[in-house]
C-alpha cells in the first residue's frame, strides 16, 4: 500500500452563542480535516485542530512531498521522518499540529486496512 494523495481541507463554522477566549469573543471556529488516500483507495481521516490555512500550507508544501509514495502502515517511521525534517521549525505550534493531523489519518488507515476499530 502506498500514499497517493494528502488533502488538507480547512473547516469553519459559526458558534452560537459566541464564546470567550484569550483573543476575545469568538463567533467563528475553524479547524483542518486531513485526508490521506492510498493506491488501494483506503482513505484515512485526521484532524489538525487549529491553524486552518497556515496548517494546510505546512501539509501541502512541507509534509505532503515527503510522504507521497510511502507505505502508510509504517506510522512510526513516517512520524520520525516528519519530525526530523521539520526540526528547524521547533517542536510546538503549527508544524506539530500538522504532523498530528497526518498521524491521526495514518492510524485511521491502519485500522481500516486491518478491519479493526481504533
Please report, for each region that a protein language model flagged, where it lies by residue:
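Structured beta-strand/loop patches that form or line metal/cofactor-binding pockets in enzymes
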Residues: 1-40, 45, 49
Amino acid at each position: 500500500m502506498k500514499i497517493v494523495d494528502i488533502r488538507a481541507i480547512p473547516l469553519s463554522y459559526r458558534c452560537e452563542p459566541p464564546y470567550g477566549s484569550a483573543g476575545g469573543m469568538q463567533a467563528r471556529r475553524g479547524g483542518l480535516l486531513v485526508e490521506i488516500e492510498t493506491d488501494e483507495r483506503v482513505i484515512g481521516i485526521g484532524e489538525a485542530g487549529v491553524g486552518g490555512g497556515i496548517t494546510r500550507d505546512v501539509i501541502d508544501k512541507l509534509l505532503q512531498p515527503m510522504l507521497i509514495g510511502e507505505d502508510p502502515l509504517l506510522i512510526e517511521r513516517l512520524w520520525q521522518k516528519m519530525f526530523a525534517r521539520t526540526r528547524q521549525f521547533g517542536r510546538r505550534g503549527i508544524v506539530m499540529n500538522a504532523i498530528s493531523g497526518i498521524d491521526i489519518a495514518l492510524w485511521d488507515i491502519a485500522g481500516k486496512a486491518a478491519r479493526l476499530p481504533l
